[in-house]
Amino acid sequence: MTKQTIKQTPFFLDAHSVLDATLRDAGYLNDWSFSREEIFAVVGGVAESGVEVVEVGYISDKPDRILAGCCEPDFLGELREHTKGKINLAVMISLTEKNPQTLFASRQGVLDLVRIPCTIEEVDDALRVAAAASEYGIATSLNLVNISTLLPQQFAATAQKVQQSGVVDVFYLADSRGACRPEDISKIVGIVRENWQGLFGFHAHDNTGFATVNALMALEAGCEIIDGTVNGLGLGSGNTKLQYAMQLVQQKEPNKPYRYEPLDRLSRFDVAMPAEKSYFYYLVGAKNLAQLWVEPLVERYGEKTAYYLQQIPRRPYTKIEQVFAEVEADV
């Protein structure tokens, strides 16, 4: 089956756009255990704000997942009816899903965009998933993660491969570790922009306090789409706050009809994170470590975790065993 044309919605027509990732990224903090009321409130409020895309969560057929953790077809249909078509519905899919084609087939007509996160080693797998989604008229985003660990030539080669594949609608860069600095973003986005002609997005994390500045630098260097979350909620130190992302895009597109009043109603929405972990997430960003390594590091080193992290050099660690070796070489 040939690839269908992307549906003509505001998201795909506008020069610059915002994607809300609250339910998906903040779900790492509570294992996506949001209630129906919370999900409808977030999706409805974001839709009223005029933001172009809302990411509802993950699609999955795993039996232990509910609501935002699996995004069943009927549930997506209810959300589409709730928002009256004012916003595009997006989800993320893990490459660990065994039957992506079945997931896409059952959600045809109620899902606008699927985001496929992958490391540079997983790009070919992600392209196969994108091809499957395209068969059902679902737009695709390949989200390259851990960009703070990659070299310039790797960005160029990956962008060229994705461009040549013909199955990806949006190429995304994700600063998954919150380790990138503004000058890094300008260079990385510039390299990809030279090799990728399609829609281009950026997802920031705020571990070292650069999420908003990095989102701005991404827009200035050639990205069209940036992510934000309600109250900046997300894994680790969170993401660019949604209202900040909206303001950055409005600087590019002054006539954007964004409304900020609906966000006031969402200001109380929160997902708790243990306060004692907040400093660890700053350190993993500063040292260029994966955020999901915080738990195993604390389990291994206990109260000495912060001290050990302060001692190790900043490097593009790709495996947690490399961090263990670095720490224990000096113990």
How should each PLM-predicted stretch be described?
Residues 2-331:
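Catalytic cores and adjacent flexible loops of soluble metabolic enzymes
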